Amino acid sequence: MVLIRVLANLLILQLSYAQKSSELVIGGHPCNINEHPFLVLVYHDGYQCGGTLINEEWVLTAAHCDGKKMKLQFGLHSKNVPNKDKQTRVPKEKFFCLSSKNFIKWGKDIMLIRLNRSVNNSTHIAPLSLPSSPPSQNTVCNIMGWGTISPTKEIYPDVPHCANINILDHAVCRAFYPGLLEKSKTLCAGILQGGKDICQGDSGGPLICNGQIQGIVSVGGNPCAEPRVPAIYTKVFDHLDWIKSIIAGNTAATCPL
């Protein structure tokens, strides 16, 4: 039986930021260098995640990506040959839906990071829009990240890979993930026949539908990209009021129940 797995994985950080043990998008293709100006590489203590720039000072990622001495890289495409406009920041503040780090609670795996200073928009750095409405079933969406391109072999690309997947009926995910409630604030997305999926190391990265961030990579199957085992994404639309309140300065804002 495919085991549920949390998608952050050990990353051996080297000066070149080469990855030796993390994983990312399965069944995709190398992203175009201009395709992901909002994509953030989040790393700490040997772990890596993805993230999404939503304005010059704020990043969305998964709560289980939290850690000490976090760094965030913007404008990154090739890890070995960085863009000239690459920028690095650290968190100034972090905001969570949970008072504890029990991030496995469905629909609460979200973290909002305020940067220590704003990033400068450039050729390879620009925010992604928040959702204006939730995605409907069968919507084609995009996933992306810097990890393994094989579910069984350690094949790590230098540049992020992208893949298209579909928003699926929530019942498909409930059939596989014990305890996932029908009304949980999550999205179920993938390819029913398998072959395309997020994987370890993709945690916190975006699910992009119609040019907007609709989901945050949370939990998936192990091995990745198995038939009828889609991944679960925190549903950004259901957290819009909380996100906007925090950014507006209401740091006591509470998450939706």
From Swiss-Prot:
Signal peptide: 1-18
Glycosylation, residue list: N116, N120, N121
Disulfide bonds: C31-C162, C49-C65, C97-C255, C141-C209, C173-C188, C199-C224
GO molecular function, one term: toxin activity
Tissues in which the protein is found: Expressed by the venom gland.
Domain called Peptidase S1: residue spans: 25-248
Keywords: Disulfide bond, Glycoprotein, Hemostasis impairing toxin, Hydrolase, Protease, Secreted, Serine protease, Signal, Toxin, Zymogen
Gene Ontology CC terms: extracellular region; secretory granule
Statement: the UniProt record of this protein carries the keyword GTP-binding: no
Primary subcellular site in the record, as a coarse category: secreted
Compartment(s) of residence: Secreted
Pfam families attached to this UniProt entry: Trypsin (PF00089)
Domain of life: Eukaryota
Family matches, as Gene3D superfamilies: Trypsin-like serine proteases (2.40.10.10)
Catalytic residues, chain numbering: H64, D109, S203
UniProt keyword Signal present: yes
TM spans (from-to): none
Enzyme Commission number, as recorded: 3.4.21.-
Family: Belongs to the peptidase S1 family. Snake venom subfamily.
Functional summary from the UniProt entry: Snake venom serine protease that may act in the hemostasis system of the prey.
Subunit relationships: Monomer.
Protein name (Swiss-Prot/TrEMBL): Snake venom serine protease 2C
